[in-house]
Amino acid sequence: MKLMKLLKLNINNNNNNKLLLKNLLLLMNKNRLMNKLSNNNKYLSELNNKGNSLQHLNNMNNWKLQNYNYNKNNTINNYINSKLINKLLYKLMSLKNNKIIISKPLYKINMNVINIRFYYYNMNNYNYNNNIYYINMINKLMNRLNINMNNLSNILSYYYNKKVIIEPIKLKYLYNNNEIMTKYISLLDNNKYNNGLLMEYQRTLNNIMPKLNDHNISMNYINNINNINKLKYNNILLNNNNNINNIYNNININNNMNLLMFKYLIGWSIMLKGRLNKNISRISTTYLNNGTFNNKKYLWGNLNNNFKLNYINSNNNIYNYNNINKNGKYNIKVKLNYI
């Protein structure tokens, strides 16, 4: 009986200590906020500056492997296995049709399930004569990946001792994934564009890229950020005399947040560097810029200086690709800017 009472007392003391620590942290945070609220303009400008970086609002991470980490050796094995499976998927997807480009697969490894997701794009999307063949071919591939009894997911399940799910996602447009877009550009015939490379690439890209309404979209995005900051500021003012726990619970910004998650492409930049032309022996560099990466100051000067639209890490997707053609080695760097 005495032991039971002692255990209960210890549990109660631990709970009380946790509550006390939580309240102390909240009080310290409240004092910090109240000190800043003494100068309203200063605090609002600080919120706006944080909104410009957008990291606290749009935390979309570019990850390739999410691993349930319970064993370091197992983590290393999962990484090595993912490399082997990547090669297998590349071979499998190009077995029937070499016009299919796939991105690097994403692995999400949990206790009981492994989810493998990758994006693919068919370069014959605009060739309507191949539609029936393409549909039949994709059906066969899906059977091999997930549906048939002897499919790849079942084989990998035996290997991992847990369920494996493969999710191939078809992309309608190249610019939905920077890796696929970079691979597509690398497959274009550079020798065909020896004279007038810049013009030919621009013509090709204009056919596959959206007609950007980037300026208006960016202004709406910035206005939404400012509205969110005002909501946060007003919420703190309204709750500063109430229970401190309510400061973080009474704000609702879901309506604005729905507009912020990688829905719009507002700029793209492509750099081609290397031996791209038979007639020029030296290494040349070519830049193609559009949208927020456009160098026209009268369009983007003020916005880029104030809001750093091209330097938001969570919104920028960058991919490099090296290749060799008949003229020599060259590099392609693609930057896509989403909001």
UniProtKB/Swiss-Prot annotation:
It is found in: Mitochondrion. It comes from the Eukaryota. It holds the Pfam family VAR1. GO terms for biological process: mitochondrial translation. GO terms for cellular component: mitochondrial small ribosomal subunit. InterPro entries: Ribosomal_uS3m_fun. Keywords: Mitochondrion, Ribonucleoprotein, Ribosomal protein. One of its GO terms (molecular function) is structural constituent of ribosome. Essential for mitochondrial protein synthesis and required for the maturation of small ribosomal subunits. Belongs to the universal ribosomal protein uS3 family. This is Small ribosomal subunit protein uS3m. The gene is VAR1.
